Amino acid sequence: KQTILLSGFDGLAELYMESLPQGTPLHFAVRANEPIPPDVAYSAASTIKIPIMVSVFNHLGEPTPDLALGWMRGMITQSENPPADALMRTYLDENLGPLMVTEDMRALGYQNTFLAGYFYTGAPLLQRIQTPANSRTDVYLDPDFYNQTVPSEIGDLLARIYRCVAAQDAQNTDLFPGSVTPNECQTMLNLLAENKIGALI
């Protein structure tokens, strides 16, 4: 935070960092060199594919079908959109798959993370979703109506996946206990580790 403030950065920066497995999160936001309340609504873009992956595992049993794993690999490691749509249509709901992802995120306590439509060109907006983050009046970044998140929620979701791997069984996780297993969480971590797209922040 001090580095950002000393640099005189006049834009908006928000950071969420957690020391795993059970560290205290560091979370702050700065705009025009002044601290502001965090959890600004952002367009989720391809980060929403992490909730899609989690949601699909929540609704699938083991062993995970090879078809699903192949689509997940394309979605996560190459950031491709068609596999994301295929996963939701096939394993969630043909028409309302994105809203099922949103429901699963709500079940985890995330009020600002949602997916309101498929990725394909011309996909309809299934629901106009209002959240605490996109209802703020002090800062508004014109986030995408189709998918949004905030750093603390996507960061916490990643932390849950990490902790799930270390759990002794599926009942001891804080990521859909009894539904998402440590083996499935390890698969998710492996896929995320394969994402080596050379894009600068």
Residue ranges and their predicted role:
Residues 40-63, 75:
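Active-site SXXK
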Residues 57-82, 107:
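Active-site-proximal loop and beta-strand segments within enzyme catalytic domains
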Residues 1-34, 88-201:
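Penicillin-recognizing serine hydrolase domain
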Residues 39-40, 44, 142-146:
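Conserved aromatic-histidine-acidic binding/catalytic patches
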Residues 44, 63-67, 162, 180:
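Short, surface-exposed helix-loop/turn micro-motifs enriched in polar/charged residues
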Residues 36-38, 66-72, 82-90, 139-141:
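Short acidic, glycine/Ser/Thr-rich loop/turn "cap" segments at secondary-structure junctions
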